[in-house]
Amino acid sequence: MEQIFSKLKFITHGEGFIDITYDLNLCVEKNNFDSGILNLTSLHTSCSLTINENADPNVLRDLKKYMQSIVPYDSYLTLSKNREEISYKHYQEGADDMPAHIKTSLTNTCLSCLLYTSDAADE
């Protein structure tokens, strides 16, 4: 079994989603993959990976709004009976940094995807 390592870099502009499908497809083509497992890892501590559909832009809009509602920027309400508001202590890297760390903890920093061509699936 052959293993190939490739490193991809993406420029980001703060909170949001980046569709990396095209870049992953180029990497697969460049390395002549036809079947195997594609392991993806984010090396950044406030970035994560998700797999979602790309047909309806409302999916990403809804995901962003939901994440903003459960992980607000400045403070959060405790889940206790009295719903105390707590401010984040970690803010040295910007107001969006602590919420980004929390969102990363709630999602994935690694994904594995089955990769095969229609020819490989027929074997």
What role is predicted for each listed range?
Residues 2-12:
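Short amphipathic
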Residues 8-10, 40, 49, 104, ...:
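Preference for bulky hydrophobic residues occupying beta-strand positions
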Residues 16-63:
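Active-site beta-strand/loop microenvironment that shapes enzyme catalytic pockets
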Residues 50-52, 56-91:
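Helix-adjacent hinge/juxtasegments
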Residues 74-115:
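Mid-chain, well-packed structural core segment of small domains
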Residues 116-121:
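Conserved small/polar residues in nucleotide/adenosyl-binding loops
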